[in-house]
Amino acid sequence: MTWKLYTDPAGTQVFSGTLPFATYSDNPGVPQDGVLYYLEKELDPVDNGSYRMVAADGGNILLTPSDLNPGSGHEITEIKLATSATGLDSATGGASLSLGPQLYSGVSNAVAVHVRVTTSVVTPGVSVDLGFDKNETHILAA
């Protein structure tokens, strides 16, 4: 059982790790927004919140941008995370997003993770330099 990022709120398409954003060389630095959904549905197919995730240290569950290939061109500060689209305006690039002290399983308990990418890299190509990390957690029966 594992919470995963999905590209849709119903949890039918697992996030592949690539955001479909394009930056054009004549217009770099323009923010592009998207939404991912963080949820667990494998052990809770009836969507009744049977399980909960808690941070191992007793604090909040954190989702953090990570640099998968340091020095490769993209920096974690290019990614802002928020739980709402309007929250992206005041979010700090590269900062962790707190998802609260616990999350419950099931599609109806999906957490929207709004993502804003602002990059000045203008080299054409697909970049897989950046990803997401989560702090250590435990899964418990609800």
Please provide the spans of the model-predicted regions.
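Primarily extracellular surface-attachment and macromolecule-engagement regions
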Residues: 13-24, 68-70, 81, 124, ...
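Intrinsically disordered, low-complexity Pro/Gly/Ser/Thr-rich segments with frequent PxxP/GP/PP motifs
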Residues: 86, 91-122
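Beta-sheet-dominated interaction scaffolds and their linkers
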Residues: 2-46, 55-58
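Short, solvent-exposed loop/turn segments enriched in Ser/Thr/Gly
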Residues: 28-39, 109-112, 122-134
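Low-complexity, Ser/Thr/Pro-rich intrinsically disordered linker/stalk segments at domain junctions
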Residues: 23-25, 52-63, 92-105
